[in-house]
Amino acid sequence: MSSRENYVYNRNPVFTAPKNNKRRPSFICYAMKKASEIDVARCELNYVIQPKNIKTGLPLKRFRRLNEHRACALRAMVSAMLYHFNISSELVQASVEQLSDECGLSTLSKVGNKSITRASRLITNFMEPMGFVTCKKIWDRVLGNYMPKMITLTPLFFMLLDISEKQLINAKKQQLGWINKNLITKGLKPITVIEAKRRAKDIQMRNLFKYRISKHNFYKKRKNAQRLIALDEKEARQKILRALVAKYSISELTTLGPSGLKKQVNISYYYLKKIATNRYPDN
C-alpha cells in the first residue's frame, strides 16, 4: 500500500445514527434517501460554484474535483448533517465533534487525545467556502472560550440532493403546521415561520449551554479526582477522611462509628478512582 493510500484513517467513512435513533420527519427521511442515491461529492455544483473566502468574500482558487478521501468524508457528512437538521431553525443540532464521531472521521492518538481535524477541515475549507453551510461561533462568557460552531444548512446544500428551495419551503410550512397543531391542542396561539425559527434556535442554545456547563463540571471533578488519586494511597485516604469528618456532624460521626467511617472512606476512594479514568458520556 502506498503512503498516499495510507495517509488517512478510515478511507471509507460512513454515517452511523446515534443509539437513541430518534424518529425523523418525513422530509429528512426523503433527503437522506436522496443522499444515499446521489453522489454528492461528484455533483455538478461542485464544479461550477466559485468558492469564496468566508471572511473577505473574495474568490478562492478552486480545484477540478475533490480528492477521493475528502469526497468519501463529504458523502458521510451530508447524511449526518441531514439526520441532525432542524427544519424550523435550519440548524444542524449536533457539534462538529459529534458529526465527526458518527461519521467515523475522528481519530485517537496513542495517548488518547481525540482529533476531529478531518471533519473540521471539510466544513471550514470546503463546505463553508462553497456556500453549502454557514457557521457561527459564539463566545461563552461562563467558560471563557468559544462554543461549538452553530451550523446552518443553506438552500445550496439541498441542491446537492436535487431538492429545490421550493421543496424546502414546503417542508418548513408542513413542520410549522405540525407545531401549530400541537400548540392549539394545548390552548396556545399558533406561531409564524419566523417565530418557530427563533424558538428552535433558542432551545438549541439553551441545550448547548446546559451541555457545556455539565461537561465543564465533569472535567473539573475528574481533574480533582486525578490529583487525589495520584497521591500515595495512604495520603489520599487521609485527605478523604479529613473531608468526611468536616462534612458530617458530631452526631452523624457518632452514629457511623470507626467502622462506618472507614467504609465511607473506602467507597469514596474507589468512586474517585473511577471518576479519574472516566470519559464524558458524549452521545
Swiss-Prot record:
**Any keyword Magnesium?**
no
**Transcription regulation in keyword set:** no
GO biological process per UniProt = DNA replication; plasmid maintenance
> Which InterPro entries does the protein's record reference?
Plasmid_replication_init_RepA
What cystine pairs are annotated?
Answer: none
Protein species of origin: Buchnera aphidicola subsp. Schizaphis graminum (strain Sg)
Q: Which domain of life is it from?
A: Bacteria
Know the name of this protein? Probable replication-associated protein repA1
- Keywords of this entry: DNA replication, Plasmid, Plasmid copy control
Lineage, top ranks: Bacteria, Pseudomonadati, Pseudomonadota, Gammaproteobacteria, Enterobacterales
The leader peptide range reads none
Family to which the UniProt record says this protein belongs: Belongs to the IncFII RepA family.
**Role noted for this protein:** This protein is essential for plasmid replication; it is involved in copy control functions.
* Xref: NCBIfam families: RepA_IncFII_LM
Q: Which ranges of the sequence are coiled-coil? A: none
Pfam families referenced in this protein's UniProt entry, alphabetically: IncFII_repA (PF02387)
